[in-house]
Amino acid sequence: MMIEDDTGFVLHARAYRETSLLVEVLSAQHGRVGLLARGVSTAKGQVLRAALQPLQWIRFSAQQRGELAQLRGAEALDAAPRLVGQAMLAGFYLSELTLRLAPRQDPLPELYLAYGEARARLAVGAGLAWTLRRFERELLTALGLGFELDSASDGQPIDPAARYELDPQEGAQRLLSERGGERRAAATGSALLALAADEEPAAADLASLRLPMRRVLAHHLGPRGLKSWEMLEQLAPRR
């Protein structure tokens, strides 16, 4: 199958043999695509190599053969965001999460748009925590793994003053215990309603979403977590 003039975001690239790269791209028309880019380490291939850096938005053509597609050509469509510090780790997180959960060769236009929007927010220095929570919500929805955020699993409307655990399969479940550990790991009702309405909540409510959303994602990721979680963990108080 030929892939002609598709656009995509580079999620990951690593060296393969002496002059090639193995590249993972989230594309607009074909979903996640694995590419073999030959000759990028030669003098003539430097421009192509530069276009295949993580977070780069590209237009590309390839010949699909089995799991990997042979890259025929690619060009950068903009300047990749120059991210540093926390924003750089957040960009790594977006890409790693997409790489782990999005299946290959399954078009996911909503996820493509969500990734592009999150990338744009990182580029302009938008709030990291809200950018990540919005992307997590959109990713789960695009993969068919999302759930209602404005009503609990028992059908009752979310109470802004209550706290809720997020069950990966059932959705929001009202917390009945006020024990400190359980309370800290639960999202506020206000935060869930804000996430449902796509309106950034107050800082304390926003912070309450991190652990419940991670629990949901961890369920779908399986026993192997994310490398980016290990790095982001130390930044949690500031996110």
UniProtKB/Swiss-Prot annotation:
It comes from the Bacteria. Belongs to the RecO family. It comes from Stenotrophomonas maltophilia (strain K279a). GO terms for cellular component: bacterial nucleoid. The gene is recO. Pfam families: RecO_C, RecO_N. InterPro entries: DNA_rep/recomb_RecO_N (IPR022572), NA-bd_OB-fold (IPR012340), RecO (IPR003717), RecO_C (IPR042242). PANTHER family: DNA REPAIR PROTEIN RECO. This is DNA repair protein RecO. One of its GO terms (biological process) is double-strand break repair.
